[in-house]
């Protein structure tokens, strides 16, 4: 790996760790290394960022917390991979997104959550909704959402 890539990777990780408010660096490092982010890891990011649990929460409990709050439609197995459409839906539950008409009518259904994130330039429009998301992509999208939708 070139020196510039290493420096950029370190800066990126530091930015992510800061934007996720002190979440366990071990978990963030693990997510960055994943070819596919898991449901457990995705739910962990969401519950810790929202302050629904501390950073010691396990993935299974994170899934149950989001399920009980209605932020995910079903309690999936924690090691399942995450498709882009489902990642967009989980992220849309974190922030108050002023979406388009269909997004509001459907209460941010997965389809329209993804369309909104694409419309807002967070996710490239050419991406297939059912493609599996890598850990680094999930954190990139998380950071972009945080910058775009976080209340100032």
Regions found by a protein language model. Name each.
Residues 7-16:
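Sec-dependent N-terminal signal peptides
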Residues 70-72:
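Primarily EF-hand calcium-binding motifs
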């Amino acid at each position: 790996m070139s020196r510039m890539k290493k420096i950029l990777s370190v800066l990126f990780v530091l930015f992510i760790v800061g934007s996720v408010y002190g979440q366990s660096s071990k978990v963030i490092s693990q997510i960055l290394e994943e070819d596919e982010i898991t449901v457990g890891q995705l739910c962990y990011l969401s519950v810790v960022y929202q302050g629904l649990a501390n950073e010691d929460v396990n993935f299974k409990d994170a899934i149950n917390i989001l399920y009980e709050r209605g932020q995910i439609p079903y309690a999936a197995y924690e090691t399942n991979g995450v498709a882009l459409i489902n990642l967009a839906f989980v992220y849309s539950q974190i922030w108050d997104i002023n979406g388009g008409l269909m997004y509001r009518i459907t209460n941010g259904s997965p389809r329209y959550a993804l369309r909104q994130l694409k419309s807002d330039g967070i996710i490239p429009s050419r991406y297939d909704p059912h493609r599996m998301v890598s850990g680094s992509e999930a954190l990139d999208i998380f950071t972009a959402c945080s910058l775009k939708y976080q209340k100032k």
